[in-house]
UniProtKB/Swiss-Prot annotation:
Protein keywords: Hydrolase, Purine biosynthesis
Organism: Methanococcus maripaludis (strain C6 / ATCC BAA-1332)
Top EC class for this record: hydrolase
Classification of source organism: Archaea, Methanobacteriati, Methanobacteriota, Methanomada group, Methanococci
Name the record gives this protein: IMP cyclohydrolase
Cited InterPro entries: IMP_cyclohydrolase, IMP_cyclohydrolase-like, IMP_cyclohydrolase-like_sf
Length: 201
C-alpha cells in the first residue's frame, strides 16, 4: 500500500510519547533526514540540483520549541513552530498555519499533515483541498496512529498500529521497515524521554 509521506504518533511500550515522520516516495527517492542542530531535522535531497526540480522536497520536518515538538511533511513546520514560540495555543497554531499554507499546489493537491507533541498532550492536523481538521489525541502505551497524505488522510482510531522499540533509533527503524507501507526513503523520530531525543534513518 502506497500512502506517501506520513506521520506516526504514539507511545512506546514503556509509555514515552513519540512522533515519527517517514518519507515514502515514488518520484523523489534520493532524500535524507538530517539533524541540523539540537532543535531541527530537515529533509534534504542527496543531490543538491534536485532542490530546484520541486519546491516541496526540501523542508524542516521537525522543530523543537521549548517543551513542544512539531513534525510535519513540509514547510509549515516552521510556521507552526513560530506561532507556538509567539505564545499561541497549540490548537490555534495548527489551525492558523494549515489554513494559511493550505494544501500543496502540486499535480496531486497533496495534503499538509502535522503533529504537535509535548510530554502531556498530542495533536494531529491536516488540510486537504476539501477539508481541514485539528484534533487532540489521547495516547496509550504501545499504540500509535498514522496520518498520511494519500489513502489515509484521516484522524481515526482505525489507523492504528502497534510500534515496538524503546529508543528513538529503534522506533525510527521500526517505522522505516514497516512493510505494509511501500517506498520508504528516510525517517526521523522525536521521543519524549528526559527531554527530547532525536533520531534519523
Amino acid at each position: 500500500m502506497y500512502i506517501g509521506r506520513f506521520l506516526v504518533l504514539g507511545k512506546t511500550e514503556e509509555g514515552y510519547p513519540f512522533v515519527t515522520y517517514r518519507v515514502s516516495s515514488r518520484s523523489f527517492p534520493n532524500r535524507v533526514a538530517k539533524v541540523m542542530d539540537d532543535n531541527t531535522v530537515a529533509i534534504l535531497p542527496k543531490e543538491l540540483e534536485e532542490m530546484f526540480k520541486n519546491p516541496y522536497i526540501t523542508y524542516n520536518c521537525v522543530k523543537l520549541v521549548g517543551d513542544v515538538a512539531v513534525a510535519t511533511n513540509g514547510s509549515h513546520t516552521d510556521i507552526i513552530a513560530d506561532k507556538i514560540k509567539l505564545g499561541l495555543p497549540i490548537r490555534d497554531a495548527l489551525s492558523y498555519s494549515l489554513l494559511t499554507m493550505d494544501y500543496e499546489k502540486d499535480d496531486y493537491n497533496t495534503p499538509r499533515i502535522a503533529v504537535v507533541l509535548t510530554k502531556d498532550s498530542a495533536y494531529m492536523g491536516y488540510v486537504t483541498d476539501s477539508d481541514v481538521r485539528i484534533k487532540k489525541v489521547e495516547l496509550e502505551a504501545g499504540k500509535a496512529y498514522y496520518l498520511a497524505v494519500y489513502e489515509a488522510c484521516n484522524i481515526t482510531k482505525h489507523q492504528e498500529i502497534s510500534v515496538t522499540g524503546k529508543t528513538a533509533e529503534e522506533v525510527t527503524k521500526f517505522v522505516m521497515d514497516y512493510e505494509k507501507f511501500e517506498k520508504p526513503v528516510t525517517a526521523a523520530t522525536v521521543l519524549v524521554k528526559d527531554g527530547f531525543k532525536l533520531a534519523t534513518l
